Design a protein with these regions (language model features):
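Glycine/small-residue-rich phosphate/adenosyl-binding loop
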Residues: 44-116
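A glycine-rich helix N-cap at a beta->alpha junction
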Residues: 68-77, 152-177
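Small-aliphatic-rich amphipathic alpha-helix that forms the alpha element of a beta-alpha
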Residues: 34, 102, 106-152
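Structural motif
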Residues: 99-101, 135, 160-162
């Protein structure tokens, strides 16, 4: 079994997966572990939608790309210029054709929602890595607005997607990228 430090050092963002189904039971175990993440005032505001249908994942990708490009054209969001051409490519799937997609969702009325969901998302990614699975938080995949798609995902009014996470069996685990030393601004003793 991996130590916690080994887990921290070995987790990677994975965007290339084996064409292998991820059992729902494993995803449910991972989500159960994610509920152990801390949240403000122990509010536990995170909810989850699981998508393991490739056609639906592709449709969600297309919806997100369309909304992102529309927002970009209307100056509602900034994008790295390199992303614009990629998003216009009909064959590009923002979810990288992953076998499974987890949306971390919560109520917009919760003041700490983004922080709480980010903590749950990190627990998802570490739980998956401990099982030899790969994950990646796909920020470009959060732009789902179509009411039918939101209904399909079970997202009620007043809730939003915070963290779309792809998950599956990695084709390979890339080498670690260089990490900077922590920038400690000050120590007050």
């Amino acid at each position: 079994m991996m130590t916690f430090t080994e887990l921290l050092k070995n987790r990677r963002a994975i965007r290339d997966f084996q064409d292998k189904e991820l059992p729902l039971k494993i995803v449910e175990e991972i989500l159960q572990e994610s509920t152990l993440a801390p949240s403000a005032s122990n509010g536990q505001p995170c909810r989850f939608s699981i998508v393991n249908c490739k056609d639906t994942i592709k449709a969600l990708s297309d919806e997100s790309k369309e909304n992102l490009l529309d927002d970009y054209a209307k100056n509602k969001t900034s994008l790295n210029p390199g992303y614009v051409d990629v998003l216009k490519d009909k064959n590009f799937n923002v979810f990288y054709n992953a076998p499974c997609l987890i949306f971390v969702i919560g109520s917009t009325a919760v003041h700490s929602l983004e922080l709480d969901c980010a903590l749950a998302a990190s627990y998802i990614m570490f739980s998956a890595a401990s099982r030899g699975l790969g994950t990646c938080w796909i920020a470009l995949g959060a732009y789902i607005r179509d009411p039918q798609m939101k209904a399909l995902l079970g997202i009620p009014d007043g809730c939003e997607i915070v963290a779309p996470i792809i998950i599956g069996y990695p084709k390979e685990i890339p080498a670690a990228s260089e990490r900077h030393a922590p920038q400690i601004l000050r120590v007050i003793s």
